[in-house]
Amino acid sequence: LTGAYNYDTQAFWHNWLRDLALGQKDNSEGYIGSTVPAQGKGGIGFLSMLGWGNAVSIIPTMLERIFDDKEILKEIYPSLKTFVECEIGRMKDDLWISPSLGDWLSPNGNMAWQAMNNGPVSNSFIVNDLNVIRRAASILGLEEDHLRYERQYNKTREAWIKKWCSPDGIVASDYQSAYVMALKYLDLDGDLKKKVQEKFVDNVRRNGLRTGFFGTEHLLPLLMEAGEKKLC
């Protein structure tokens, strides 16, 4: 995002997304490999760890925001749809159940724990993918797709909240990265959002920074949104 803000990287990202789409053809299910351009076959499941493959929705959203790119959704839609269908195919009770590293490289260094407890982080990326594709389908006039992904977005979002978010605002047993991802991607309702923000701020005050590779970029903006300028 910072690079795109400071430099004209639009053509670079269009080309990179074409490489991403080509890499999906290297495996049987359309997963996105762990590198783009792909270095060998993308593999199934583990080599498409969530957070990496979700660039298929995150980068187009950035291009729209920074460059007012009107063509990117049409260009990337087949690739995005292929990946989202892979995600849905690996769901149980509307949540992802395959391996992932979670919010790795956090200061506590416990990568095994992060991998074993990757669910709230991984599934927040899926909620965002579904949100992006339902909007893209609507913009592109793909009504059947829009209805399908609208339903799945609502089901996965509700399943996430039910599984990891308690009524008092504690998220995933007070896991800092889960607070961040919930506030970033889950579009929490007003009262619940306020409670989650309060627990999130309390967690940061007690523990300092405990987010990893995925959560850290959102930490300060979310603290600012919660009115915690001094804590930032």
PLM segments and residue spans:
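Active-site core of glycosidic bond-cleaving carbohydrate-active enzymes
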Residues: L1-L231
